[in-house]
Amino acid sequence: MFHDVNDSETSRDEPGLEVRSYFVRGRNALLTRADFGELYVDYYLHQGQLGAQHEPAHDELLKQALAAVTLHAAARPWSESVAWTIHLREPLLNLFVAGDNRLGTVIGQLFTEDVKDDGRQLFVADVVRERADSRRSAVEFAGGDVFRAVEQYYVQSEQRPARFFQYGPEDFVFLSAQPQCDLAWLEGLDDAAMLTLDHTEELSLLETRRYRWECGCTQVRMFAVLAQVMRADPEGLFGAEPVLRMNCPRCGARHTITREALEAYVSGK
């Protein structure tokens, strides 16, 4: 049932975050919902391993973005992966989150250093689907709420409305319009209506998907990131040092790259 996201033995036994998708009959809307407590624990464990600590307000923004990209991904085809970069002016920072439906993974990071204020807030979405060209769209948005930013992205880029609601402390619901959606109903929903939605509307469970916190970054992937620069300017990359230390741009994990190993990788390509 909609009112309990953890009401099955399967949800307790299988690893990873469970996201349930429902079709709202008669309204033509797709609803995805999950409790993100488990994913947030994995995020904090990852930060602890890195020795990183963000301001609580910044953490909340990234947690919102992680919830948003996961619920969005669960509403998209299985063959699709998505990455969002969200530039905020106040506080001045960049959020990066990504979800891969094929692998069932979610990752994210926030950046506060060397972030320039260019006078606008920007939401950049990169979408990759199997056997199709990647697609990028960028929209400007107002305000400092991540969920509202995604809603503005939907209106401007997806050309359809979508709504986020907080059902519990770490329990979020996402509703997106489908063809012939009852737009007046969708746009008129509020928090009180969401609490009784399973009693007032006919919800049909479509599927469940599972997501886990995982980047998949490896030293070989870091080689691929650095290969072009290594070919063009190895001295500028390493200087006189035999070792380069870098952070994964997706999750912040630290990698140590030796010049010898990178040279071998580049020469083998």
Placement of each model-derived feature along the sequence:
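Interaction interfaces in information-processing and related assembly proteins
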Residues: 2-206
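Cys/His-clustered metal-coordination modules, chiefly Zn-binding fingers
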Residues: 178-269
